[in-house]
Swiss-Prot record:
InterPro entries: Ribosomal_bS20, Ribosomal_bS20_sf
Gene3D superfamilies: Ribosomal protein S20
Keyword rRNA-binding (UniProt): yes
Homology family: Belongs to the bacterial ribosomal protein bS20 family.
Listed name of the protein: Small ribosomal subunit protein bS20
UniProt xrefs under PANTHER family: 30S RIBOSOMAL PROTEIN S20, SMALL RIBOSOMAL SUBUNIT PROTEIN BS20C
Source superkingdom: Bacteria
HAMAP family membership: Ribosomal_bS20
Keywords (A to Z) from UniProt: Ribonucleoprotein, Ribosomal protein, RNA-binding, rRNA-binding
Keyword Transcription regulation: no
Pfam families attached to this UniProt entry: Ribosomal_S20p (PF01649)
Name of the coding gene: rpsT
Natural source organism: Gloeobacter violaceus (strain ATCC 29082 / PCC 7421)
Function: Binds directly to 16S ribosomal RNA.
Amino acid sequence: MPNIKSAIKRVDVAERNRQRNIAYKSMIKTFTKKFMTRLGEYAQSPSEAVLTEVQALLNQTFSRIDKAIKAGVIHTNTGARKKSRLDAALRTALAKAQAKAG
């Protein structure tokens, strides 16, 4: 436990930032899981309603990732990689749905 006042403040700031980082990362994971779940449902039975919901979830997930980047919680390249992988998953599911339909 630090004795110097500035060191005590640094500990408080570090804890506050750690809690904020946990919240942002958890939010990204939650929205990613929601997106992937709905995407799996779309892959099983493609429909316009589910596709619209999947695209809305993708936009929300991208927004959360961008907010985490802006807050400095994740690195820019990490955010870009996550977004790219989500987009690739959507494109793969759309291609499979078209192959199934056609």
